[in-house]
Amino acid sequence: LRLFEQGLEDGVQLYFHGQLVHGCRATKLRSEAFDAFVALPRHRDSQRAAAIPAELDYRQPRQPVNLAVVPVFPGLQASHLQALLGSGVQGLLLECYGSGTGPSDDLALLEVLRAARQRGVLLAAISQCPEGSVVFDTYAAGNRLRSAGLVSGGGMTREAALGKMVALLGAGLDVESAERWFALDLCGERA
């Protein structure tokens, strides 16, 4: 209760085992300890949205959304992504190496991503590093992923990126609008 008396930051907060954590930065690191949740440090990498449109208000009903998360790993093949993206997935969160790199020399894999984006699938990239950020311009490999249709999740955690994808796609936004709003900081998720 003392925390509430001091005032809170805007947005969602997680209170667990006497610790208050900013919801958009929270991730669970431990499964067998009471201090299971931490706020991962990330740098600010996005412009704050001037206003949130009514259709994105949290009180608005949402449609169910079919999402998938795929970590990039040695041996990831185009056929893996083709099977997943052909299953009706509306959004794919690709967990890239470091600052947003992956198997960018695999032309078949890049074509699968490009075709999914053209079909209206929202493709986003975050870093596998707990304290990482996707900056596609860092390496040529990142530029190729961006050219295939991925949008940078910047320094968002997996939890924040998935929540944002559900909010945007569940509101019925088309993929272009969803990409535009995904790139903006709406509630501290990219701060």
Description of each model-found segment:
Residues Q6, P61-R62, A115:
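A generic structural signal for short, solvent-exposed coil/turn residues
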Residues L1-L14, G18, H22-T27, V175-A178:
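Short, glycine-/small-residue-rich phosphate/pyrophosphate-handling segment
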Residues L1, K28-F34, G142-S147:
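A glycine- and small-aliphatic-rich helix-loop capping segment at beta-alpha/alpha-beta transitions
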Residues S104-A191:
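ATP/nucleoside-binding phosphotransfer catalytic cores, i.e., glycine-rich phosphate-binding loops
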Residues Q13-S99, S104-D106, L184-A191:
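Accessory alpha-helical/coil subdomains and C-terminal extensions
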